[in-house]
């Protein structure tokens, strides 16, 4: 799967904002910015547009990013727990070692997005549209991945314990490196999913089959 990375200027050419230095203005659009160590919980940033930006070690818990747009953006070691990103758009975005516990991404659009080393337990991606999205080394325990509309989705070494996959088309998706203990799923949802022999036996038990 080809993933286009975020296209961002060198940091020396970005406009820097920080918690202890220059604070970002109250604007609707931000382009070519580095947000370093900002602490802005519960901030109202709905419908804002961010292009060519880096968020580094920012505390963005409970922030309202409803209908916000992110193009060519990197989130690096940020805390987005309980952030509301419903119907937001993410295009060429990387989440690196971030926390997205209980983040709301209902009906969001994710295109060319990577999540690497993220803690995203209870994240809600219900009815999200995913196009070339890769989850690597992520904790997705009890995540809601219901009714996903996905094209080219990959999971590598992720923990999906008790995650909900109802009405999520998993055909052709390789889950052999992932933990699938107690996932919530229907038989049609499993059709075409690639699993290991051990995983196949565990999934059979979830569906009420007796394996001898």
Kindly label every feature range from the protein language model.
Residues 2-212:
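Tandem repeat scaffolds
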């Amino acid at each position: 799967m080809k993933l286009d990375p975020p296209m961002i200027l060198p940091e020396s050419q970005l406009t820097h904002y920080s918690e202890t230095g220059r604070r970002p203005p109250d604007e609707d659009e931000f382009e070519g910015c580095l947000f370093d160590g900002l602490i802005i919980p519960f901030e109202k940033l709905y419908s804002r547009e961010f292009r060519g930006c880096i968020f580094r070690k920012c505390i963005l818990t409970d922030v309202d990013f409803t209908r916000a747009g992110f193009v060519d953006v990197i989130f690096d070691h940020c805390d987005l727990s309980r952030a509301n990103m419903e119907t937001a758009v993410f295009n060429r975005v990387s989440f690196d070692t971030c926390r997205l516990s209980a983040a709301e991404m209902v009906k969001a659009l994710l295109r060319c997005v990577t999540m690497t080393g993220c803690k995203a337990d209870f994240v809600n991606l219900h009815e999200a549209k995913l196009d070339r999205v890769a989850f690597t080394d992520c904790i997705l325990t009890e995540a809601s991945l219901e009714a996903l509309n996905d094209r080219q989705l990959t999971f590598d070494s992720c923990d999906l314990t008790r995650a909900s996959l109802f009405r999520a088309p998993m055909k052709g998706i390789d889950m052999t490196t992932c933990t699938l203990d107690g996932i919530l799923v229907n038989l049609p949802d499993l059709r075409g999913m690639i699993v290991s022999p051990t995983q196949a036996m565990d999934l059979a038990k979830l569906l009420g089959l007796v394996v001898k």
